[in-house]
């Protein structure tokens, strides 16, 4: 098993891209801005506290089993606050939406939503 911060499967292209000075600096600035501002939440638990506001909206929570950025516990806590959402855990994935398992679940969810009236 190879685990990186962004994904479960080693991606040579991603490593090369993150190693480019211009991209690395831009990404670091965005990440720092996000974290310095507390993710732009009014409290660390805002998402869970306000989940009741979206309980009437169909949703899918796609979570990589080996996500070290947003641990599995985060998805479980959100699902407990929003039980109507479909929680899908991808066994061989981390955090990146580009990982095959995550990507296929996101596309499937999008296809399901396309059929809603």
Q: Residues of each region from the PLM?
A:
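Short, conserved loop/helix-junction motifs that constitute active-site signature segments
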Residues: 52-56, 81-82
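Short beta-strand/loop motif that positions the catalytic acidic residue
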Residues: 54-55, 61-63
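Conserved alpha/beta-hydrolase "acid-adjacent" motif
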Residues: 68-74
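Catalytic active-site module of serine/aspartate enzymes centered on a nucleophile-bearing elbow/loop
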Residues: 85-117
